[in-house]
Amino acid sequence: MATLVANITLQMTNSIDLVRSTAVRLLVEVENGSRLDGLLDTDPFVDARDRRFLHQLSAGAIKWRDRLDWIINSFSKRPVKSLAPEIRQVLRLGTYQLLWLDRVPERAAVHSSVELAKYLEHSGTGGFVNAILRRVIAEGRNVAYPDVVNNPVAYYATMYSHPRWLVSRWLDRWGAAATEALLQANNEVPPVYVTLADGTADHPLPASFGTVEVEDRPGVFRVTHPEGLFDDPAFLAGWFVQDINASLATRLLAAEPGDQVLDVCAAPGGKSMQLAAVVCSGRVTATDISQQRVQRMRENMLRLQRQQIAVVVEDGERPAAMGPFDRVLADVPCSGTGVLGRHPEARWQKDAEDLRRHSDRQLRILESAFARLRPGGILVYSTCSLEEEENDTVVDAFLARRPDASLEPASVHFPGMAWSARSVQTLPGRDPGDGAYAARIRRLLPGQSRSA
């Protein structure tokens, strides 16, 4: 069956919709552990409209998976999880189009789903899919959900389609209002932000992209009409994509002209480019464990002419002998719970045990990075996680081991900001942009104490 689905795009009949059949294939692969963005990079479509529709279908069905399953199970005698993987995705896609995409005619959504089911199995399966989707049209908007008072975890997890273990911990930490806003933000189409590689406006983007500079984020612009952006000569000459909050870590690091800076786990390289624009005659050493990601960084540095950046393949847990550095940025691998809106499949591919595995590795990387920082220098530890185990807990464990390390409150550098106190923590739904964490740590001079 899986082979059959994989060959849909190669063995088409007139009755099978190419975009929707490809979406089924992608969804099956994502459910088996693949990343959606990697699959979309290899999709066969040249037409921009088809590419956008494929992305919309795939990302939407993934984000809303559990709510879609709840709706389908309300009308099916066979639980969704008991169905063949391909038929499960056909039903999810059909239901998503009927209830979320107003511009898709009901007839087109039902007909394409039925034809796909018949192609994948037989006419009887097509009849089963047709019956379910007809019920969805008639009653899908009136389905009863778990009671928010008696079972808030089940309610929020189902209504906003997130894993229950994650919803439970967020409710405990953030409360109902902030958690609901966070869940809702994760299901919205994430905005596109771009940053100037050198902090100057020598390569302004055409007005058709609708770029607007973000308040309190110098050099960061929101792109309201991003179609065609990545092929535009002005973009290629001086811009890169980066979330509004990605620059918070580099601003907290506060590198200065002439500094020698180490950027650990640097891919895709946006922070390195920001740092290079600041250090001028200094140097940025950007490291990453992945040869493929390092090659992509090198291509971006060449495109944007950032000669003061050296890109090195390196394991952050077992670094080479380099340094000491004036500034170190350790933007460590994490669970990514702050960027679930940009990676819809990630919410279904994680569990609570991932947090422990990440935190152990994060502490090792932090210790290795700090060892290459000169006395008196500054290190910023950052993640795109919302979880305390990966953020303050890691920093506290590190400080307990290193009496020559001192935490400097982030509020000094971001006064008056609700997301800035002991450390930086932005929260989607409460704050613009992705979830981001950053803590500023100074390496004390010999004989200096934390109270000094």
Predicted regions and their residues:
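S-adenosylmethionine
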Residues: 1-452
